[in-house]
């Protein structure tokens, strides 16, 4: 994790800079006025990773300056949730005098939630044995007795020890409704919980008058699929990463949503299947008949690289397109294609990553008349 200067006095200034930059970037597309969704000014980040430095009897978190590569001590991290900040000193204090817990520990990863759960992964340059398990269980109990709802994982080369479970349960509020999400260690989750809620509300608002079904590519753990299901008859969603697909299935069941179907496929393979160029056994096994779906709307949330040309062409076949982007540069490249057939009717900036140059954008497109 890189150095990050969190300065609440500068928050509005940096947000105004992003607003201006994003508006300027997309001015050629005749976009509507930008809708801007703010982040909390501090304690907004639900996860954080720190290296661990050992100095005599002392042990503390460090980060590295991106430019000079020099390490610096981190006792508190204002970007991270209050839960992470509360736990940071208690965790090192509890491990400092225990040889099996601190020996060759080199990194600590935190995954926290708005719901109050937190998961800690301890990474070691050695194999972990029975003594570590006993001491880690005692550590977990000690911290839970102090009021945390915590789970612990030990990791080493080709080794992962889960004391209880390797995930947290997050609860996000969307227009007064609470959605349950399983978030698994080391899999993608939205880092800024409060902004994630605003993104879901925006997506629900954009699609509230929808007819027919929704197709979603790159659905992750079902983050958007579940909230959007209320606006569609059915939702068909694709995701390639196996842990994310498993989480999505868990989340569908936990939220008692019955009109969402997840398939484990890449967007590229799904494009081939939709065009009827090839049959896929996994679609047959899941008893999914693509022809039975009436998808007028497509939702895409691609990786930083954006969508390839073939996927863009396939996406153009839908009346309405919702595109969430973590990289405005590749969004712009994709819009060069999509804007040939569609107009942008909603345009949003979500400040997922305050005090950095990163911008999360949302566009809603409708087929030209």
UniProtKB/Swiss-Prot annotation:
InterPro entries: MeTrfase_TrmA_AS, MeTrfase_TrmA_CS, SAM-dependent_MTases_sf, TrmA_MeTrfase, U5_MeTrfase_fam. The keyword tRNA processing applies. It catalyses: uridine(54) in tRNA + S-adenosyl-L-methionine = 5-methyluridine(54) in tRNA + S-adenosyl-L-homocysteine + H(+); uridine(341) in tmRNA + S-adenosyl-L-methionine = 5-methyluridine(341) in tmRNA + S-adenosyl-L-homocysteine + H(+). Pfam families: tRNA_U5-meth_tr. GO terms for cellular component: cytosol. Its EC number is 2.1.1.-, 2.1.1.35. One of its GO terms (molecular function) is tRNA (uracil(54)-C5)-methyltransferase activity, S-adenosyl methionine-dependent. The active site is at 326 (nucleophile), 360 (proton acceptor). S-adenosyl-L-methionine binds at residues 190, 218, 223, 239, 301. Belongs to the class I-like SAM-binding methyltransferase superfamily. RNA M5U methyltransferase family. TrmA subfamily. Dual-specificity methyltransferase that catalyzes the formation of 5-methyluridine at position 54 (m5U54) in all tRNAs, and that of position 341 (m5U341) in tmRNA (transfer-mRNA). This is tRNA/tmRNA (uracil-C(5))-methyltransferase. It comes from Vibrio atlanticus (strain LGP32). The lineage of its organism: Bacteria, Pseudomonadati, Pseudomonadota, Gammaproteobacteria, Vibrionales.
